[in-house]
Design a protein with these regions (language model features):
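N-terminal loops that bind phosphate or other acidic moieties
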Residues: 1-52, 56-240
Length: 240
């Protein structure tokens, strides 16, 4: 595994497990404590904390967590899977003996049984930073799940959500007004038809505040994508 080419910190989080077979997180309490401490530390270094998220399988665990916490939308039944047979929700809910919404008020159990390490750590970092810095969650469905977890745990502080125009349109079409749904301060970044992911909206928002237009950000992203795919200097067309 290659180390990131930027400052980073390790939380020691083990990989999540298959929620169809058992609890997805073996020590969610330790993950929460690590994330909370990290959030508090980072909040002391500036007046704003922007969080992105990237976790293999995160779209599935986010759907499972949101369904368990009572959120309703067709998109939550649209699991990205090529397998035939029962859906991830049908498997996990059968194991737990629950129906949609049965874990309302038991957010930590929902995250422990159905979530993933990044989901818990993102929520914990947000909670740890509350009161010390403005927190902006950057992403789509996974950050919506982190926000839902925080609200279920009783966090009433201000939570900001940055997302791209494309992702905001998709989420609003599925859930309605996101601000009303979870009391979020929503900031939408215009990156055309690019869906959010890995903190793209937050990074673009910070870059725009530093004088870089969205078009320039997109062009650079497509060029880098082309270089990665071809191993040679790419172009916007080559990176599509």
């Amino acid at each position: 595994r290659s180390a990131p080419k930027c400052p980073y910190m390790e939380t020691g989080a083990p990989a999540g497990q298959d929620p169809a077979k058992g609890p997805s997180l073996l020590d969610a309490g330790l993950l929460w404590d690590s994330g909370f401490s990290l959030g508090r530390l980072l909040a002391g270094l500036g007046d704003r904390l922007v969080l992105g998220i990237s976790c293999p399988g995160g779209e599935v665990t986010s759907r499972l967590t949101l369904k368990a916490l009572g959120y309703r939308a067709d998109v939550l039944d649209d699991f990205p899977s090529r397998e035939e047979g029962p859906s991830p929700w049908e498997k996990a809910s059968s194991r737990l003996g629950i129906r949609p919404g049965d874990l309302i008020g038991h957010g930590f159990k929902a995250a422990s049984e159905l979530g993933d390490p990044a989901l818990v750590i993102a929520a914990a970092m947000t909670a740890g930073a509350m009161g010390g810095a403005e927190v902006l969650l950057s992403g789509g469905l996974q950050m919506l799940a982190a926000s839902a977890l925080l609200r279920d745990l009783g966090e009433k502080g201000k939570i900001g959500l940055a997302t791209t125009v494309r992702t905001e349109k998709d989420l609003a079409g599925a859930f309605g007004d996101l601000s009303a749904l979870l009391g979020l301060g929503v900031q939408v970044v215009d990156l055309g038809e690019v869906p959010d992911g890995v903190g793209a909206s937050g990074a673009a928002l910070l870059a725009e505040e530093s004088g870089f237009a969205p078009e320039r950000i997109l062009d650079r992203a497509f060029r880098l994508s082309g270089e990665i795919e071809s191993g040679a200097p790419g172009s916007r067309e080559g990176g599509r």
